[in-house]
Amino acid sequence: MATRPTDMVNTMQDAAVTCGPIPGSHKRYLGGVRFPELRIPLREIRQSDSRKRDGSLEVNPAIPVYDCSGPYTDPDVVIDIHAGLPAMRWQWSPTDTAIESRPEPGSAYGRARLADVRTADLRFHHRREIRRAANGGNVSQMHYARRGIITPEMEFVAIRENQGLEHLRASHPALFRAHRGESFGAQIPDTITPEFVRDEIARGRAIIPANINHPELEPMIIGRNFLVKINANIGNSAVTSSIAEEVEKMVWSIRWGADTVMDLSTGRHIHETREWIIRNSPVPIGTVPIYQALEKVDGKAEDLTWDLFRDTLIEQAEQGVDYFTIHAGVLLRYIPLTANRLTGIVSRGGSIMAKWCLAHHQESFLYTHFEEICEIMKAYDVSFSLGDGLRPGSLADANDEAQFAELHTLGELTRIAWKHDVQVMIEGPGHVPMQLIKANMEEELQHCFEAPFYTLGPLTTDIAPGYDHITSAIGAAQIGWYGTAMLCYVTPKEHLGLPDKNDVREGAITYKIAAHAADLAKGHPGAQVRDNALSKARFEFRWEDQFHLGLDPEKAREYHDETLPQEGAKAAHFCSMCGPHFCSMKISQDLQEYAQSKGEDIETARLEGLQEKAEDFKRLGKNIYLR
C-alpha cells in the first residue's frame, strides 16, 4: 500500500539514525595550515600493548584511518536530523565574493513544492539560503584551480588523503613495510599537498564534488592519484521505503565506508526526500536528474522536454546535489548498434534517452543543449558524472561497438565541459570478463583524457544472482588497480530487488575491500599500515585489536564468539579453527621464543631443534613406536 503523507510525517517525527563510535575507535580532527578553521576528520583505532617474552610491554600506536562517517560517530556531537548538520563550509574563508543569495527557489518546480500545502508536513523546515554564482560567473573548484587558487576544499582533501600517518613514519617504520606496487602510469606522491590537489583538478584528472549549496559537506577528492573511493546507492521506489528509511540508509552507508552516496529515488516525494538526505549528509550526494524529470511526465519518456529537464537541474542544484549523472552520450546513431546485443540497453537512464531519441528521431536534448547544462553546473559547482547509458548488461555484450562509441562521445563532452571549467568524471561498466577489463581502463584514459573513471563493478560473471556483490568486487578490485578512481558498490540484491540496511552494509564492506586491495596493488603510500598492524595483532593473539582493526569489527567479533564466547577466549593463543595444539602462529611463536632463549637466529634454532629430536630418537632405542 502506498504511504500516505500523514504516515510519512509520523515516520520523520519518530525518526532516528545510527550514531556512536565504531568499536575500538575514536574521532580525531586535524587543523588546516592555510585555513586554520578547517577541522579534517579521521578515525583512530586504539591498540593494546604487546607483552614481550621478558614480561615487558611494547606500546602499539593508535592507527589513523580515513573516515567518512561524519559527526554521526563523534560522541561529542548532538545529532538532530530535523535541524541537519552544521553549515560548516559557509564558515570558511570565502574564495570568491561573487556569489549571490536567493530567498526563493529559482526553479519553477521548487517554488511549486514550497507553495504546496499538501507537502508542508513533509518538508525539511530549517531552510538554507540558496546560493549561486553572480552575474553568470563560475564557482567551480576547477575554475579556481586553473586560476592558481588553492581553496579551503583543496587543503581539506590534501590533509585528509594523508590520513594523519606522517607521525608514524618516524616512530614506527616497521608499519610501513610494503611491497612495491604497479600503478600503470598513475603518479602518486608520498605526501599529498594542496598544490598537488590544485594541479590535478586543473588538469581534469581529479574532482572535488562540492556544490556551494551543500555547506554540510566534508570535502573529498576523486582521482586515480588518490585513494580509491566507493559510492553507495540508496533511494525509494514506488513500492518501498520512506524518507526516514532513506536518511538512515545514507547514515548507515557512510558508517561502513561510503565516500559518496547517490539518491536514486523514483517513488513519491523525491524532492522532499532529497532535501532531508542532503541536509544531513557529510558526503557528496549524486543523482540522476532524468529520473525525477520522468516522474514529472508520468513516466512517458517521449514527453520529456529540455525546459522541464533544465528546471529539474536548477531545482536539484539549488538543493545542493554535488554531482549529476547525465546520459548525454546516447546518440541516435548508436541505438542500432545495440540491436544484436544479448541484453540490449540495461541502463535506466540510457533506455529513457534511447526511447526519446527514437520517438522524436533526433539527437537527445542532453547532447544538443550540453553547453547550456555546463552553464548551470558552473554556477553551483555541480560536477558531471557522464553516464554510460550503453554499458554492457552481460558478459556477451562487453566491449562492443555501442559501448565504446558512447565512451568516445563522453570524451568529446568532457572537453566541452572543461572549456567551461566544469568538473567531470566518466561512468563505466557494467558486466566485463576479467580478460577484457584492462581495455576498458585504457580506452577511458585515452579517449576521455584521464578524467576520473567511476565504474559499477564490473561484474566478472553472470551466474551468481544473490552474490553479485562478490562477482562485481572481483572486477572492481582489478579495475581499481588499473586506475579507476571510484567504485560504485553492488549489493547482494543486485538484479533482484531494492537493498535493505543489511544489504547496504554488505555492499559497502565488500567494496571497501576491493578499493583497499587496489590501493595496495598500486603501491599507495601508507596503504599497508593497517594490514601490518592487524597482522601483528593476529600473530600476538590480540583478539580485541584484530576485531577493531578490521573493516567490520562487529561481524569479526560475532564470528569469533559463535564458538568461543567466553571472555577468556579473547586472551587465548588459539581460535576454534585449529584449537590450542595446531595453531601455526602459536607454533611460530614457540619457535621464536626458543631461538631467543638460545641467543640464535630462527633457522639455526630450527636446525638445532631437529638435531635434538634426532638424538632423542637414537637414545630411546631407534624404535618408530614407543611402547
Curated annotation (Swiss-Prot):
Keyword Metal-binding belongs to the record: yes
Gene Ontology MF terms: 4 iron, 4 sulfur cluster binding; carbon-carbon lyase activity; zinc ion binding
Catalytic activity: 5-amino-1-(5-phospho-beta-D-ribosyl)imidazole + S-adenosyl-L-methionine = 4-amino-2-methyl-5-(phosphooxymethyl)pyrimidine + CO + 5'-deoxyadenosine + formate + L-methionine + 3 H(+)
Cofactor mode of binding and number, as noted: Binds 1 [4Fe-4S] cluster per subunit. The cluster is coordinated with 3 cysteines and an exchangeable S-adenosyl-L-methionine.
Annotated positions binding Zn(2+): H431, H495
Residues annotated for [4Fe-4S] cluster binding in this entry: C575, C578, C583
InterPro entries in alphabetical order: ThiC, ThiC-associated_dom, ThiC/Bza_core_dom, ThiC/BzaA/B
Domain of life per record: Bacteria
Gene Ontology cellular component annotations, sorted alphabetically: cytosol
Cofactor: [4Fe-4S] cluster
Described purpose of this protein according to its UniProt entry: Catalyzes the synthesis of the hydroxymethylpyrimidine phosphate (HMP-P) moiety of thiamine from aminoimidazole ribotide (AIR) in a radical S-adenosyl-L-methionine (SAM)-dependent reaction.
Name of this chain's protein: Phosphomethylpyrimidine synthase
